[in-house]
Every structure is written in structure tokens, then in C-alpha cells.
Curated annotation (Swiss-Prot):
The keyword Lipid metabolism does not apply. It is found in: Periplasm. It comes from Prochlorococcus marinus (strain MIT 9313). InterPro entries: Ecotin_sf (IPR036198), Prot_inh_ecotin (IPR005658), Prot_inh_ecotin_gammaproteobac (IPR023084). This is Ecotin. One of its GO terms (cellular component) is periplasmic space. One of its GO terms (molecular function) is serine-type endopeptidase inhibitor activity.
Amino acid sequence: MQASIQNRIFFGLVVLWSTTVLEPLRAIPRMDLNDYPQPIAGHQRWVIQLPGLLAKSSDPGLSTNAVDWRVQLIVGRTIQLVCNQYHLAGQGLRMERFQGAEQRMLYSVAGAVKVMSTRMVCPPDEPKRESFLVLGSKPYLVPYNASFPIVVDVPDGLEVRWRLWKAEITQREAIKL
């Protein structure tokens, strides 16, 4: 009799634990890429799964509402540099929506990306330095949405990085002309 009550309590706690701990984990789909087309030949797929909750900012002037946040996608390549000026040349990111995938989008770089540089003669004793060259001159911002992964297909040899942009709480008035 005593063992039966202990078993009921144990199984009750297991059910309670599974509904309170495991259920929230199912609330945000994780890395479900079934609806996405395969990357084309010569491209690599990079995936960003945004956290549902972020640590609170120490700056009270920044919005804590995810609707006010953006994710900057940064495509580039790490290379060894000498004294010349370098940049990546090619088409920037583009967004593609596809049928039957709700709010899911695929971001990709089409075409070749080349390293361009000046051709100055560098001092022979100057050491090389490693640097991350970014494709494009303007930030590519996408809405913050932890419900779906951000999927980016880029040509082989490139990598994808990201950073979070948060808006200020304060709104300022524009000047009416």
C-alpha cells in the first residue's frame, strides 16, 4: 500500500515535471530545416538559431521588447593581409520566401565573391595580419524572430556572422518643415 502511494506520487511528479519543463522547450521549433531547399552546388548552409530569451541589458535606455530588435547578418572571409587595401566584391545578400513555409525565409549570396585589393609594393619585412573582410558596405538587417532559424546559403569559402541590434526606448520628434 505504501509503495503504491509512493509510485503514484513519483509518477505524478514526473508528469508535472514533463509538462512544466519539457513543454516550454517545444514551444519554439528548433532547427527544423525540412521546408528549406538544399543549397546549390558550391554553396554552404549556415544556420543561426536565436535564443528565445536574452540576458537583460545593463542599459535602461534600450528596449527589452524583441519586436524592436534586429539581427545583422555579416557575410565575409578571413584572410591574411599585407599593406594593401582589401575588400570583397560580389552581389550582396538577397532574401527568398518560398511556398508553404509560413514566415520562413532563405538568405543567400548569388554569384561569385572575389577579394579585391590595391597592388602596392609592400615592405618585405612587413608581417601579414589576419582580418575578416565583410561583403557589402551596408548592414543587412532582418527581424528578430526566435521561432524560426535564420538560414543563409553562401559560396564556399565565406562565413556568416551575426550581431544583435536593439532600439532605444526614447523616441525623438522630427522637425516639420
